[in-house]
């Protein structure tokens, strides 16, 4: 195999690994939402345990990116793709971390909030929107689709709106019954992690724009 063919193969393998890692993180978020919905502490524990695999994938991808940069000294589009992989792998790993963070809270919520709790139900709706943002960001990354990336960025406004609405509702809960403060704070942390997940999806989308244009947040890079 020629050097160029091997290089192209390595780039494609890197792209596939990044996609696989992204799907694992997205699945972790989906599983966390399902565990939250049915108050399943055992499922939550499995999500926390599974985060180690996502962390290992991050380290592997970072190593492969550095190897390609040092051995091949890529330019133009290939350099942007590898640089983007090194950036988005961090966001994807953080998405997995936040899924595990949510899972760690679930056993506490089980004891203080009943199934069908309105605030929990609203948090799940918010979470589904954030989860869809992840899927759409990953699709945009795979296809290098700038228009799809823009739609992901625009979708974050709705997740932010939900976060603020639920936060206000939880504040009202505490005002009406200070004894509910622990239950409210636990759920506040859940929605904060979901809001951050949406932010990480936006970050991925912004790096898709960089791949296509060489500009990141309206600043020219290379």
Model-derived features: positions:
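Cytosolic, long alpha-helical scaffolding segments
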Residues: 1-222
């Amino acid at each position: 195999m020629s050097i160029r063919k091997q290089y192209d193969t390595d780039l494609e393998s890197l792209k596939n690994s990044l996609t696989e890692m992204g799907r694992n993180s997205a699945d972790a978020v989906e599983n966390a939402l399902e565990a939250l919905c049915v108050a399943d502490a055992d499922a939550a524990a499995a999500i926390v345990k599974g985060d180690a695999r996502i962390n290992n994938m991050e380290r592997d991808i970072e190593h492969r990116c550095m190897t390609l940069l040092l051995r091949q000294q890529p330019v133009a589009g290939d350099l942007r793709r590898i640089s983007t992989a090194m950036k988005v792998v961090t966001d994807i790993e953080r998405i997995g971390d936040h899924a595990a963070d949510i899972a760690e809270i679930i056993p506490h919520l089980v004891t203080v909030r009943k199934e069908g709790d309105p605030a929990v139900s609203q948090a799940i709706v918010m979470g589904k929107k954030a989860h869809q943002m992840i899927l759409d960001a990953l699709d945009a990354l795979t296809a290098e689709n700038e228009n799809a990336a823009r739609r992901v960025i625009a979708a974050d406004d709705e997740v932010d709106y939900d976060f603020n609405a639920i936060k206000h509702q939880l504040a009202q809960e505490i005002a009406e019954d200070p004894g509910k403060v622990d239950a409210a704070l636990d759920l506040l942390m859940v929605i904060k992690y979901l809001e951050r997940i949406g932010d990480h999806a936006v970050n991925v989308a912004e790096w898709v724009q960089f791949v296509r244009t060489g500009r990141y947040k309206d600043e020219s890079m290379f």
